[in-house]
Regions:
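Extracytoplasmic Ser/Thr/Pro-rich, glycosylation-prone low-complexity segments
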Residues: 1-264
């Protein structure tokens, strides 16, 4: 072996390996339709995300991607690579946004005059993404006007084991603004290591009483010049029931494996 361990054919030796899986560095993605099989229930039983964002048209507080689920001290924190940058934190927008633009946690808005905690309920007039006039460096999961101040909840959970954990963010029975009898339930799942994003849509209603019912399901980079959306779901009128989609980086997963000898 390259590290100098020599093995004798008549000797029993025990080998172990450390596998290091760095985040991917790609800015290219593909979209896939996948079977509708949510990894957990939408009302997860842990209301952590409500503490981060539980109001109408507001950004929550910056949070660790393993918020409420601290790992073993010997296990790295949950991180996610998004357009070539690795993030340990994010911030939730009440209208279906997950933003990695947290360097200025008091001003997550394209319109500072509206107030720095204001999560704009509509940017549809700016057109489809990619678009510098829309929220950037974020996941639109989907992005449209939901009103959590009158009902519903946002749930958060980490499932699985390192290095294959999943961060689940679930928008559960959120009333549509101007159509409060219509309830939206959907979740976004982030995979560490592979940096895959999955969307599970139990029910995404259409409310044409507000902004003609326009909504966007996809991602956009920090510059606003690259974006990926589900076909037909880019600043358009669409509804979904029991659908699932995946956005995954293009390219092979890179890893490093270090072998070492240990005693029996």
């Amino acid at each position: 072996l390259n590290n100098g361990i020599q093995l004798q054919c008549n000797d029993n030796k025990y080998l172990a390996a450390d596998i290091f899986l760095p985040g991917g560095g790609t800015d290219q993605h593909v979209v896939e339709s996948i079977p509708y099989n949510p990894p957990v229930s939408y009302n997860l039983g842990n209301s952590y995300a409500s503490q981060l964002c539980n109001n109408d048209d507001r950004w929550g507080t910056v949070f660790s991607l393993n918020y409420g689920f601290p790992p073993d001290p010997n296990i790295p924190n949950f991180t996610f690579d998004f357009y070539g940058v690795t993030y340990p934190q994010a911030v939730i927008g009440a209208n279906g946004l997950i933003s990695f633009d947290y360097t200025n946690p008091n001003c997550f808005t394209q319109n500072p005059a509206a107030g720095c905690t204001f999560c704009q309920y509509t940017q549809e007039g700016s057109g489809p993404i990619p678009n510098t006039g829309r929220y950037r460096n974020c996941i639109m999961a989907p992005y449209y006007h939901i009103n959590f101040s009158i009902g519903g909840d946002i749930y958060f959970q980490i499932i699985g084991e390192y290095p294959c954990r999943k961060m689940v963010l679930s928008y559960y029975q959120g009333p549509m603004f101007s159509c409060t009898s219509l309830l939206a339930t959907h979740m976004c799942v982030l995979y560490e290591t592979s940096n895959v994003i999955e969307f599970y849509l139990q029910n995404k209603p259409i409310c044409t009483a507000w902004e003609d019912g326009l909504a966007t399901l996809g991602i956009q980079n920090a510059a606003g010049n690259q974006g990926v959306t589900i076909p037909g779901y880019n600043n358009s009128v669409w509804g979904a029931t029991n659908e699932a989609w995946r956005i995954k980086p293009v390219g092979e997963l890179e890893y490093v494996m270090n072998w070492y000898k240990r005693s029996a």
